């Protein structure tokens, strides 16, 4: 192999007692793993998201539920995955639902903390929308929790609120989380 990352990963596996030269199932793993991480870690520019004027008569809450995502824990480089929910009260603008998904994908394609993921997504949406209120919640399974130590199972929840909902504290978060 002429790929330094693949060579380093093969050496790492060898240190763990896994020989890529003699185990045919592992033979191409270092190359594939290096390619996967390159694809994952090379961050594209933030997607362009254009807000459009709020339609006449609009102005009620916009709720986008169950947006799937996956990312890698920055501490262990193992997956965490789940669903993100976004709710906002438009002031003057809205965005297409697909735009929220593209921003979520952009935020999650790097080693990440769940708590930072919701903050980054909330910041990006707040910048584009300038809403009256915004809430981003994320419910995820953390493989670092499930694969290490006591192998704890369960979900973790992180939230970020902006505008009126941030000023009202966590009560609005609890209500919207129950939707």
Enumerate the language-model features and the residues they cover.
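A domain-level signal for the structural core that forms small-molecule/cofactor-binding pockets
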Residues: 1-179
């Amino acid at each position: 192999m002429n790929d330094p990352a693949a060579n380093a990963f093969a050496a790492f596996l060898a240190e763990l007692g896994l020989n890529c030269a003699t185990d045919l199932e592992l033979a191409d793993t270092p190359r594939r793993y290096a390619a996967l991480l390159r694809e994952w870690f090379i961050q594209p520019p933030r997607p362009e998201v254009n807000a459009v004027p709020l339609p006449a008569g609009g102005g009620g809450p916009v709720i986008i539920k169950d947006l799937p995502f996956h990312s890698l824990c920055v501490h262990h480089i193992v997956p965490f995955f789940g669903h993100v929910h976004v709710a906002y009260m438009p002031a003057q603008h809205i965005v297409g639902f697909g735009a929220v998904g593209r921003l979520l994908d952009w935020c999650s394609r790097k080693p990440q903390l769940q708590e930072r993921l919701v903050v980054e997504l909330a910041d990006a949406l707040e910048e584009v929308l300038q809403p009256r209120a915004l809430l981003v919640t994320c419910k995820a399974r953390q493989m670092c929790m499930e694969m290490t130590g006591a192998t704890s199972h369960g979900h973790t929840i992180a939230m970020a609120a902006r505008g009126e909902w941030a000023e009202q504290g966590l009560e609005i978060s609890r209500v919207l989380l129950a939707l």
